[in-house]
């Protein structure tokens, strides 16, 4: 046999810790959407029309249990932070899992939080030990969260095409 199977349950897991699982019953994973490259293009109106705000993918039965409808703003909270995202209710995700793409809002660059602390999934992730013992990475995926319906979107973000303006930061000469 060339390869030996290896699996290690994540440090935060409903399988490992019942107390945490009760408080944070969902597992967060994250990835990328095809409209943006790393942290770029969120200032381009055409791209924001395609993917205007961060979305959280939620399985329909889970959304219903939390009183969340498609398009509702949702609080997403881990042990490390709390952000908001818009609900995308879909059968394209497992019932115990939610998924988000990292996001920031360049239109709020002049605010105290520079437009990322309200909606960026990285606020929720872990960057301290224990690390993945095989490759030494931080836990950027597979950590526990809870969700609840939010009253509104974060203040000052573009949500509709008529809000979008091409924006380019200008450096000082």
Language-model features, listed with the residues they occupy:
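Long, low-complexity segments enriched in small/aliphatic residues
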Residues: 1-44
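Long, contiguous, secondary-structure-rich segments that constitute the structural scaffold
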Residues: 39-57, 61-173
